[in-house]
A protein has these predicted regions:
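An N-terminal, well-structured beta->alpha segment
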Residues: 2-3, 8-106, 195-235, 243
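Gly/Ser/Thr-enriched, mixed-charge loops and adjacent short helices
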Residues: 34-43, 154-286, 292-294
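Conserved phosphate/anionic-ligand binding catalytic regions in large, soluble enzymes, centered on
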Residues: 39-59, 146-149, 239-251, 307, ...
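N-terminal small/polar loop signature for handling phosphorylated ligands or for N-terminal nucleophile
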Residues: 90-153, 256-313
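Short Gly/Thr/Asp-enriched flexible loops that form oxyanion-binding sites at enzyme active sites
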Residues: 102-110, 153-160, 310-329, 365
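Glycine-rich phosphate-binding loop plus the immediately following alpha-helix
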Residues: 159-189, 329-352, 357-366, 422
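Phosphate-binding and adjacent anionic-ligand microenvironments
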Residues: 295, 299-301, 322-324, 342-538, ...
Length: 576
């Protein structure tokens, strides 16, 4: 661990800070706890890049940390050779405070290192950055975004040539490189306007939007059903003050939606997210304005995309006519079942279709896929792993991936992006809602029909928050305890199989026989129980919390709900 007081003094007297930044550091002079939290070490550079609160300090998101991270990334790109520098990087940003300044700072560092830059003139959805990397044949990509985190946060996501987030070996190479670079004296910079004049920086805009949207619109399977209900079918949409504001409505109107109502207060681009406590479509509370509008106009379907427009959440009217949130697990199952049928009806289904999900995503999705002749593969959490699996399957000629999704509201569709994509997902979820509307069904009705057909599956995710400097220690201690003294039963139900994705081992609890899984190298534990329930435990990659996933099934809705309650009570004992 760094000597945080020395690091604090180094920053204070570096001569690299603005007067405001110096003033901010002087204001915490007597607060050792605050100094420690800002300077005890650098933000960890992982496969998702960097994420943190926006303050002055080494363990924070600010222009100095952005430049430093970019210098490390630039060195890794340059190590690939001159051709890689020529292919260059695509850079994008979201609506957050400082996102544009951070993106331009990253562009200046790349240009100073002789790396060609294509930077969006203004904020864009994350999937469009993935698309731009692939479309322009770039070596890499940088996206300044903290996705759905609270307004105090920003982040720095890095992509490689396939348009997916960095694989672990490249992330490790950058992290190693950063240890060699001084944050102030080790960074090259070239003024933005000078780099534009020198031809090292090019601005991207409408032309890239058009190419991206032509790919999105080619994903439509069934315009006829949309046209059939167009006069009565009403959609309410909110971008939560973020990047979906332009392209999602464009996609829905292009699909043939005549009655699209956007939540005006949340169509305002604003990185302080003034109308919501959290701009996360996983939180139903954020949809209160959308529900008001839907009730006013008589809509029964609501879509919301997060600030960088890579994740989408939906709300539909339940049996009593009131709006209920449809979870990411449920939305994915609905969309998968719909797409399999729609692609077959449209003659678009590949010969050997594959479907990808993460290990913590509902097993109902596997049932839907396999019942319909689609092969299901599991990956670790994160779209870089799904992108990697898609690339591998398709390169080997084994089949073609029609959809990939994870329970946290992310869907990857089509072949033109390698990250979660709320623009395309919003389009296809809306097409699906219209198709069911043409049959006189809401998406709530459709979901109940799927439960009757495939089984009463249920899921719940618990977040065990462990804040503070000792949070990481508490997280590690809990994982260690579950490894070294695993439970023989959970809530009175026997554990039948234990799986540890760290080393890829499986243990048959009855015989003690040890086996090997295909997947390994991730800090996740899995307990498979005698009643068919699965419980997974893993530390979050971006926040100080342990995530516990309950994946269960009942003979009917009542038994499913009782199972969720029973296992949720056990989860609460983990922190006692």
């Amino acid at each position: 661990m760094l000597n945080y007081m020395n690091e604090y003094e180094k920053w204070l007297h570096s001569g690299a800070l603005t007067a405001d930044e110096v003033k901010e550091l002087q204001s915490i002079a007597g607060d050792e706890k605050e100094i420690e939290s800002r300077f005890y070490g650098p933000l960890e550079f992982g496969t998702a890049g960097l994420r943190g609160t926006m303050k002055v300090g080494l363990h924070q998101m600010n222009v100095h940390v952005i430049r430093w991270a970019t210098q490390g990334f630039a060195d890794v790109i340059a190590a690939e050779g001159d051709e890689a520098k020529q292919k260059g990087v695509a850079i994008c940003m979201d609506c957050r405070v400082n996102s544009m300044a951070f993106a331009r700072a990253a562009a200046e560092v790349c240009a100073a290192n002789g790396i060609r830059v294509r930077i969006f003139e203004s904020l864009r959805p994350t999937p469009e950055l993935s698309f731009a990397v692939r479309y322009y044949g770039c070596q890499a990509g940088i996206n300044v975004t903290a996705s759905h985190n609270p307004k105090e946060y920003n982040g720095y996501k890095v992509y490689w040539a396939d348009g997916a987030q960095l694989p672990p070996q490249h992330a490790a190479a950058i992290a190693a490189r950063l240890e060699q670079i001084d944050i102030f004296t080790g960074v090259k910079r070239m003024a933005f306007d000078d780099a534009v004049k020198a031809g090292l920086i090019t601005l991207l805009g409408e032309e890239t939007d058009k190419m991206f949207m032509s790919n999105v619109m080619a994903m439509i399977n069934d315009r006829a059903s949309v046209a059939q209900v167009a006069d009565s079918f009403k959609v309410v949409y909110t971008p939560f003050h973020g990047c979906g504001w332009k392209l999602v409505p464009e996609a829905l109107r292009g699909l043939g939606v005549k009655n699209l109502y956007c939540v005006e207060q949340q169509m305002v681009l604003d990185g302080t997210f003034p109308t919501v406590a959290s701009p996360n479509p996983e939180n139903p509370e954020g949809f209160y304005l959308a529900i008001e509008l839907a009730d006013k106009v008589g809509a029964d379907f609501i879509l919301g995309t997060d600030p960088d427009s890579d994740r989408v959440g939906i709300m539909v009217r339940g049996a009593d006519g009131k709006f209920i949130a449809v979870t990411g697990n449920q939305t994915g199952v609905l969309l998968l079942d719909y797409l399999i049928g729609a692609m077959r009806r449209a003659g678009k289904m590949p010969e050997h279709p594959y479907f990808l999900k993460t290990i913590v995503t509902t097993e109902m999705a596997r049932k839907v896929a396999e019942s319909n002749g689609v092969t299901c593969c599991d990956t670790f959490t994160g779209f870089k792993f799904m992108a990697e699996k898609k690339n591998a399957l398709e390169a080997a000629g084994e089949g073609h991936v029609i959809m990939s999704y994870e329970e946290s509201y992310g869907y990857m569709l089509g072949d033109y992006v390698r990250d979660k994509d709320a623009v395309t997902a919003s389009l296809l979820i809306t097409e699906m809602a219209a198709w069911y509307a043409a049959k006189g069904m809401t998406l709530y009705d459709a979901l109940q029909a799927l439960y009757k057909k495939y089984g009463w599956y249920g899921e719940k995710t618990h977040n065990l928050i462990m804040p503070g400097l000792d949070g990481l220690e508490k997280m590690a201690a809990l994982m260690k305890r579950l490894r070294t003294a695993p439970p023989a039963n959970i809530a009175g139900v026997d554990v039948v199989v234990r799986k540890d994705y760290q080393d890829g081992s499986t243990v048959d609890c009855a015989t003690g026989n040890v086996g090997k899984m295909e997947l390994s190298g991730s800090n996740v534990l899995r307990f498979e129980l005698a009643d068919g329930t699965t419980i997974l435990v893993r530390p979050s990659g971006t926040e100080p919390k342990i995530k516990v996933y309950i994946l269960t099934k009942g003979a009917d809705a009542a038994e499913r709900d009782a199972n969720i309650e029973k296992y949720s009570a056990w989860v609460k004992t983990l922190t006692e």
